[in-house]
Amino acid sequence: MSSQGSPSVALSTTTVSSVAVQAGDSKIVIAVIKCGKWVQLQLAESQPNLLEIGSSQDETKKLLHDHELLLAKLKALEDRVWELLQEADKTAEENKDQSQVYDAMAETLGEAWAALVSMLERRTELLRLTSEFFENALEFAIKIDQAEDFLQNTHEFESAESLKSLLQLHEHHTKELLERSLALLNKSQQLTDFIEKFKCEGPNVNPELTQGAHSSCLKVDRLLELLQDRRRQLDKYLKQQWQELSQVLQICQWDQQENQVTCWFQKTIRNLQEQSLGSSLSDNEDRIHKQEELIIKAKEWNSAVEKLKSEALRILLSKDYVEKEHLQLSHQKLSQLQEEFGQLMVERNTWLKKANEFFNSANKAFDVLGRVEAYLKLLKSEGLSLAVLAVRHEELHRKIKDCTTDALQKGQTLISQVDSCSSQVSGIHEMMGCIKRRVDHLTEQCSAHKEYALKKQQLTASVEGYLRKVEMSIQKISPVLSNAMDVGSTRSESEKILNKYLELDIQAKETSHELEAAAKTMMEKNEFVSDEMVSLSSKARWLAEELNLFGQSIDYRSQVLQTYVAFLKSSEEVEMQFQSLKEFYETEIPQKEQDDAKAKHCSDSAEKQWQLFLKKSFITQDLGLEFLNLINMAKENEILDVKNEVYLMKNTMENQKAEREELSLLRLAWQLKATESKPGKQQWAAFKEQLKKTSHNLKLLQEALMPVSALDLGGSLQFILDLRQKWNDMKPQFQQLNDEVQYIMKESEELTGRGAPVKEKSQQLKDLIHFHQKQKERIQDYEDILYKVVQFHQVKEELGRLIKSRELEFVEQPKELGDAHDVQIHLRCSQEKQARVDHLHRLALSLGVDIISSVQRPHCSNVSAKNLQQQLELLEEDSMKWRAKAEEYGRTLSRSVEYCAMRDEINELKDSFKDIKKKFNNLKFNYTKKNEKSRNLKALKYQIQQVDMYAEKMQALKRKMEKVSNKTSDSFLNYPSDKVNVLLEVMKDLQKHVDDFDKVVTDYKKNLDLTEHFQEVIEECHFWYEDASATVVRVGKYSTECKTKEAVKILHQQFNKFIAPSVPQQEERIQEATDLAQHLYGLEEGQKYIEKIVTKHKEVLESVTELCESLTELEEKLKQGDVLKMNPNLEDFHYDYIDLLKEPAKNKQTIFNEERNKGQVQVADLLGINGTGEERLPQDLKVSTDKEGGVQDLLLPEDMLSGEEYECVSPDDISLPPLPGSPESPLAPSDMEVEEPVSSSLSLHISSYGVQAGTSSPGDAQESVLPPPVAFADACNDKRETFSSHFERPYLQFKAEPPLTSRGFVEKSTALHRISAEHPESMMSEVHERALQQHPQAQGGLLETREKMHADNNFTKTQDRLHASSDAFSGLRFQSGTSRGYQRQMVPREEIKSTSAKSSVVSLADQAPNFSRLLSNVTVMEGSPVTLEVEVTGFPEPTLTWYKKGQKLSADGHLQVLHKETRHSVFIPKVCKADAGLYVARAQNSSGALSSNVILHVTGNCRLPITRVNWITLCVVYVSVSLMYWLLTQ
């Protein structure tokens, strides 16, 4: 059926029927609604709502199940619906007129049913979709639970792999969570979209559906939000744990990589440490190749290390990572390992290269050793001598050493560098062992040079041993022979002396044997020729000559002594024989004939004794003559004075001669008695026989004298000695003949008396007597001539021997380059020989002349003296020639001595120069190696002193050299030796070196002087910086207290007056320092030295600029009355400048109240000194008339501003030294003009030692004493000294309470106080100049102190200062009107003038007392300690006495009077009210007296501090009044 149209009018809707379907908890009610011709089905009720989805999966499943049952039941009614529709069709067919209605109803009913079924099916789909959603949500929740369990469970991992698995699980859970979340989101979106679509289907929107849709969507959203919250939270924890695990994994992986890299490095390092450098060249080259490959591989590992290090650095720099300490340690370990590996690689490369060089050298060495070995085999076959073989072997040994030294040295160096016990050098050890074994083998084969050297050494040692023994023996003999010999006064003494000389002779002969053995050894081993052997040979010759001289002296002395002893002994024997024979002849009676046999025996015995006596007597006579001859030939000083012995000997010889004659007469008488008993005829017959025999013997004697008469006096000595020996043998015969003649003469006389015919024999007897007398005279003449001839020839022979030895010396040139002592000895020996030769010459000539004169006698006419005369003439001629040669030789030796002495002097100069140069270089080196801190000005000055000392030494050396040079040129003008040129060359070379070194010393000294000047300039710069900085700080601090524009303006002007002229001077100093630094250290290094100065200068200029700007700004602000706002800024400015001074005082101790009190005393001293003058106002700055009213009373001229007007003075800052003319200083520079009168009523009478505070009445007077100008200069300089010393010395720390300031806060004693509490020189320069102009006598002390300060910045003084607080100077006030000025008590000007005059004329030996530190008024709190100190100088040392209120002070339990050097003080540990009053220190000596006064004020402890508000209020009031006054006066 179908509907043809819709009614045109509104039709009513009627519920035809309703159908209820229920399945479980689900129930729907369907209403059949009719509206006109339409019939529709309407869901009237649904439980639950069609869009209700349930709260859980189970509930949804139940809803789905019930809904499916419901739908099944509903579908079961579908047939009935279709049946109804069929019935409707039938009815429509039956009712044609209603067919249209029925068709419409059928159509709408079918559509409604289909729609209803579709709706219910959609619900089924919704529930299924919801079920799927809840299923996904459940899976998502389960996954979340699993992930939570995963997070909550503790996971252990043993390796990075397990950690990776854990991270994978993390990723897996995260991924699944995301997947489940995404699926759930998609499903929820799908479900939500489905609900929204379901809700909006149909022409009308059902509110219930809308509400159900909203409820279902809300459930979905809540569940989804809950799960997503859990997921997000879980995801956060998962991410956090994953991040942590990732970090751990990253660190683990880093550790793994680090372990891998470390293992590789450690393994490689072990290999590098253990691997050998090779055992051969090829092995070494292979290892070098492997090393190159390792270098390439190491680059890769190093890149890995760098990546690890960068990763580690990234991790360390990251804030998210934990446990960084392990990583940091590993990073450091890895860096160290890499560094160690790099060092080992470098070392390994170096060692491999050195090993390669070693093996190359070893191969070259083996090649050379092979050639040496072949050459050694060739030498063995040649059979060379030891000397030649030694030379060849020595060359080979040198070649062996040269070729192996390089290899062994390289190997040893390599072993020492690596490690001698390391396995790396095992191959080096083996190769070196091979080389050494090969060298040892070849060295054993080529040992001829060692054998040769050993033998030569043995020979040298042997010869040296011989010569040493010879020298020792000569040293023992020399002292004995150097003294003259004493022959002794007795025989025993002479025998002792003889034995001593015989021992010396034996010793000399043994020494001679030693010397001969040495000479023989050198002669036999002449193949071992060397410089040492030549020297020993020369030494042996000298020793032989000296020993020869000693031997000759010993032989001569021994001969003299032997002759003398033999003479004495023989004389004694002769005397004994004489006495025996004399007794015999006097007492013995000749026997008669019956005793012929006995008489004959007695006569024969007496005759034998007589003959022995004659022989011994003549021998004694010969010994005496020989002794006298030896004495005549003795050298000068050879024998002690023997005049007495000679005299005794001659007497003995004369006595023996007389004894012979006496005994001869006794014998003759005895013989005559013996013949008396014979008959006359028998006597006559015997007489004739005796006469005949005697005549015959005389003829024989004449024949025996013929050889002597024909003697050639110029013959040989041996012939003459033989002749003399024969003559001596004939002397007994001469005596016998003489006795026979005497006997004949006596017997003839007796026979004549008996009547015998003697007359017939008288002629014969006369002839016999005459002939005998003639022969006797001839014998005497011949004996004299023979004795002199023998003596002459002996002297001549000795002279010839000496001349021959001297000629050999003349041929040899003296050792000009020998030791001066040896040459001196040689000269002395030569002179002794010369004197000996001259003596022998004179003796020979004297003997020759005597002999020739003796020959002139008549009995000697046959003796030939012609040859002797020729010999004398030749001897005279040779003597002259030889003397000339000897003199020339002596001059040569003298020149040699001079040459050696000059050479020694030059060598001494060279040694002195070397010593000076060495010590100077050591001085330079020791100074150079000092650090910059040690090379301070003091060390530099000491270095300059040392250099000056060496410069003086050099000048002294040059003077000595000049003297030696002049002496050389004067002494060796005609010296023929070329050695003089050598000396001159040496002298010239030494002069050149000395000049060069003198230039070095001079340049070094100039350099040191420049360095000293440079350091002084630097110190002056630093001093200016400190001065300027302190001034900036002080002015900045003063500016914080300034309350008026005029005060700031004056302060600014005063500051400019101080700083403006000093800046150009400082820049000149900097420029000078720059030039000096560049000159001393070069451009770049010099710039480094000067950078700090320039930087500091800029900082100071910047601080000055900032200060000026601040002062200008402050002045502008004060114009606008903006004082209160500026003060804090200025205080900040003030403390900014404190920082400027902290750098130079960085390491210094802080200064406590004692330092500040010290500063107060110093300022009080300055005020006391300056305040005694009369003030004079400049004419252009006078204050005008009463027009200015009250301001007139407050303003002073620019150069002399009063403290009352200038409200800048703080009780804390009263210790600061004021600038010249600054607001704090109550004195102008013109105040030094003491003699000027008071110029204006505005002049302020300011106390010499302090200003009374606050409420001081006019009656409270301040006492003052004007010190002499020298004291003023000393005081000023004292401030400078202590200023500089503050930066140089540490301070003792004291416990002190800082005083309360007028601004209500405690001022700490910082470095600012240390600097500002002193008085720099530059800040008082103008005052100093004016003071010196007015008082020239002060200039010397001031300059002296200034120089002392600049010379030694370390000078300090004892810090015994006043223990007083600064409350005494709580402000500076001046009363107006007639009571404005403070009263002063001053020393009369006459006393001042007299003191000054005395000071100016007293010399150093007589100086009047002078206070270099004056007393100053002090205000202290009761119970505080205080020290009143004064320093006095003068000569003689002044005695200082303390007075209090006119009474002399002495030490007691309450106070102490102290004295140390020039400082005198009174120390009161606890001050009480009774201690207040006037104290006077009076110094007196023989040149004058001087006093200094101080007033001690004692205040109570209850004084309230002046707060900052009071000052500010006062300032505001003051400015307000000033402005009102200005407005009113306009």
Curated annotation (Swiss-Prot):
Residues 1409-1530 form the Ig-like domain. It comes from the Eukaryota. GO terms for biological process: centrosome localization; cerebral cortex radially oriented cell migration. Ubiquitinated and degradated by the CDC20-APC/C pathway. During brain development, CDC20-APC/C complex degrades CCDC141 after centrosome translocation into the dilated area. CCDC141 is restabilized in the dilation until the centrosome enters the dilation, at which point it is once again immediately destabilized by CDC20-APC/C complex. The oscillatory regulation of CCDC141 protein is needed for proper cortical migration. SMART domains: IG, IGc2. Residues 642-706, 758-783, 861-970 form a coiled coil. Residues 1210-1241 are annotated as: Disordered. It holds the Pfam family I-set. Plays a critical role in cortical radial and GnRH neurons migration during brain development. Regulates cortical radial migration by negatively controlling the activity of histone deacetylase 6 (HDAC6) and promotes centrosome maturation. CAMDI is required for dilation formation of cortical neurons during radial migration. Plays a critical role in learning and memory performance through regulation of AMPA-selective glutamate receptors (AMPARs) cell surface expression in competition with KIBRA. This is Coiled-coil domain-containing protein 141. It comes from Homo sapiens.
